[in-house]
């Protein structure tokens, strides 16, 4: 049977992979969005694990709210990305300096 430590280690590994993905790839906006989503999912795994092992449903309900916000974040982020790609023909982070004043 899987213990709480197994789930916490899995969450920590996924969180570390997302941090490495953010630091190693600062060029592509799509990869940055995927790394942020992976980070949120790692936190959700920890919420569900603690909620299950403590016998409290509040953590599992909180995960549904986090997933809803993450879905909205992804939709808005990809919509902004599509507009930027149509206007600038690139998704490179270094080329997205049009907001500089």
UniProtKB/Swiss-Prot annotation:
Keywords from the named record: Cell inner membrane, Cell membrane, Membrane, NAD, Quinone, Translocase, Transmembrane, Transmembrane helix, Transport, Ubiquinone
Domain of life of the organism encoding this protein: Bacteria
Reactions accelerated catalytically: a quinone + NADH + 5 H(+)(in) = a quinol + NAD(+) + 4 H(+)(out)
Transmembrane domains' residue ranges: 4-24, 30-50, 61-81
Classification via Pfam families: Oxidored_q2
Enzyme Commission numbers on file: 7.1.1.-
Subcellular locations according to the entry: Cell inner membrane
Main localization, broad class: membrane
Entry-linked InterPro entries: NADH_UbQ_OxRdtase_chain4L/K, NUOK/Mnh_C1-like
Function recorded in the entry: NDH-1 shuttles electrons from NADH, via FMN and iron-sulfur (Fe-S) centers, to quinones in the respiratory chain. The immediate electron acceptor for the enzyme in this species is believed to be ubiquinone. Couples the redox reaction to proton translocation (for every two electrons transferred, four hydrogen ions are translocated across the cytoplasmic membrane), and thus conserves the redox energy in a proton gradient.
NCBIfam families per record: PRK05715.1-2 (NF004320), PRK05715.1-3 (NF004321), PRK05715.1-5 (NF004323)
Name this protein carries in UniProt: NADH-quinone oxidoreductase subunit K
Organism of derivation: Cupriavidus taiwanensis (strain DSM 17343 / BCRC 17206 / CCUG 44338 / CIP 107171 / LMG 19424 / R1)
